[in-house]
């Protein structure tokens, strides 16, 4: 099964040993994505809506680079640092998935940096 590395134009390579996404057999796997700038600094500290929007925009770029759309997303893994942000995160999330929603889970946990509020990893199946 050949796989392709997906790095959207204009994005920097992660500073850890992973890539933004991979494509294999029509399936896009998007790495856990946070609201970081190109130097791994957290963007929009204390703003769960802005962080969620930024994260989902990055995910959309990865999927589009692979030839898909957000409608191809079948599963999201969502990690949040505080349940008080759940409604705000869902509000923005719903904007990116206006039709049929993908399956998902959401857990509260610590993230790699204290100001990071949400991380999302995604799987999308691109129609051939």
From Swiss-Prot:
<dbReference type="InterPro" id="IPR019897">
    <property type="entry name" value="RidA_CS"/>
</dbReference>
<comment type="function">
    <text>Involved in pyrimidine catabolism. Catalyzes the deamination of 3-aminoacrylate to malonic semialdehyde, a reaction that can also occur spontaneously. RutC may facilitate the reaction and modulate the metabolic fitness, rather than catalyzing essential functions.</text>
</comment>
<dbReference type="InterPro" id="IPR006175">
    <property type="entry name" value="YjgF/YER057c/UK114"/>
</dbReference>
<dbReference type="GO" id="GO:0006212">
    <property type="term" value="P:uracil catabolic process"/>
</dbReference>
<dbReference type="Pfam" id="PF01042">
    <property type="entry name" value="Ribonuc_L-PSP"/>
</dbReference>
<comment type="subunit">
    <text>Homotrimer.</text>
</comment>
<keyword id="KW-0378">Hydrolase</keyword>
<comment type="similarity">
    <text>Belongs to the RutC family.</text>
</comment>
<dbReference type="GO" id="GO:0005829">
    <property type="term" value="C:cytosol"/>
</dbReference>
<dbReference type="InterPro" id="IPR035959">
    <property type="entry name" value="RutC-like_sf"/>
</dbReference>
<dbReference type="GO" id="GO:0019239">
    <property type="term" value="F:deaminase activity"/>
</dbReference>
<dbReference type="InterPro" id="IPR019898">
    <property type="entry name" value="RutC"/>
</dbReference>
<dbReference type="GO" id="GO:0019740">
    <property type="term" value="P:nitrogen utilization"/>
</dbReference>
<protein>
    <recommendedName>
        <fullName>3-aminoacrylate deaminase RutC</fullName>
        <ecNumber>3.5.-.-</ecNumber>
    </recommendedName>
</protein>
């Amino acid at each position: 099964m050949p796989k392709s590395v997906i790095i959207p134009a204009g994005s920097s390579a992660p500073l850890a040993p992973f890539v933004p996404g991979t494509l294999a057999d029509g399936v896009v796997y998007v790495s856990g994505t946070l609201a970081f700038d190109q130097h791994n600094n957290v963007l929009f500290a204390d703003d769960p809506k802005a962080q969620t929007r930024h994260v989902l925009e990055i995910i959309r770029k990865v999927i589009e680079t692979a030839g898909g759309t957000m409608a191809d997303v079948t599963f999201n893994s969502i990690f949040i640092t505080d349940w008080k942000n759940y409604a705000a995160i869902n509000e923005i999330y719903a904007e990116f998935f206006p039709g049929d929603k993908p399956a998902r889970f959401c857990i509260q946990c610590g993230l790699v940096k204290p100001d990071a509020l949400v991380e999302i990893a995604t799987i999308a199946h691109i129609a051939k």
